[in-house]
């Protein structure tokens, strides 16, 4: 028979986004008077001085506690105190992304994500029934949060795309090309077998270059 059973779920979220409303800078717009094919790209070149930023963080904690009543001891007159059974999980996820259209032809994107675990001592977290254990848990959690938790998984990605301004050059206005670069990095913590034995971590790294080109022969011969 169950004497008492408690389940507690906590979740806290925070998100921040910054999107700049800054007019792009065109350094050559007024310097170059002519607007022929060779100066058109320079006059249209615009620099964005600030990127857009997004940050998200979430903390999730689950605590379950159950206490069983000793019916056998009550019947025989010999009480047998059954220990409390409990389980707990405390996680902290963080994500960051940056998007920067540095020029009207060059776009840069960076994103990263971390899954961390908040370290908790294996004690009954009950302020009334176990005040010493609760204080130990509280101090340990504060320290783990100050250390940003124990990272379990980390991912990051970097992308850059450049639209080559070939169509603005008179002799190449029949072509269109773009160059892109993509790099990813992944890290996973290895499993912990015991206090003294840990499996190795897993790291993955990948890079990729892409070049795409289109040729418009109708524009070439017309």
PLM segments and residue spans:
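Exposed, low-structure sequence patches enriched in small/polar residues
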Residues: 1-222
């Amino acid at each position: 028979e169950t004497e008492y059973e408690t389940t507690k779920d906590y979740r806290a979220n925070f998100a921040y986004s910054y999107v700049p409303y800054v007019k792009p800078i065109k350094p050559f717009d007024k310097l170059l008077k002519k607007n022929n094919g060779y100066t058109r790209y320079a006059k249209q070149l615009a620099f964005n001085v600030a990127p857009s930023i997004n940050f998200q963080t979430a903390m999730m904690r689950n605590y379950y506690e159950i206490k069983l009543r000793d019916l056998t001891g009550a019947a025989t007159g010999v009480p047998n105190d059954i220990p409390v059974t409990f389980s707990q999980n405390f996680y902290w996820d963080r994500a960051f992304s940056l998007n920067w259209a540095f020029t009207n032809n060059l776009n840069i994107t960076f994103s990263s994500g971390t899954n961390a675990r908040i370290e908790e001592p294996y004690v009954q977290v009950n302020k009334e029934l176990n005040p010493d254990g609760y204080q130990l848990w509280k101090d340990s959690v504060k320290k783990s949060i100050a250390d940003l938790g124990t990272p379990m998984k980390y991912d990051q990605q970097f992308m850059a795309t450049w639209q080559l301004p070939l169509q603005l050059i008179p002799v190449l206005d029949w072509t269109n090309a773009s160059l892109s670069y993509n790099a990813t990095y992944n890290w996973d913590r290895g499993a912990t077998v015991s206090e003294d034995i840990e499996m190795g971590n897993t790291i993955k790294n990948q890079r990729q270059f892409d070049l795409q080109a289109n040729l418009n022969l109708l524009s070439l011969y017309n």
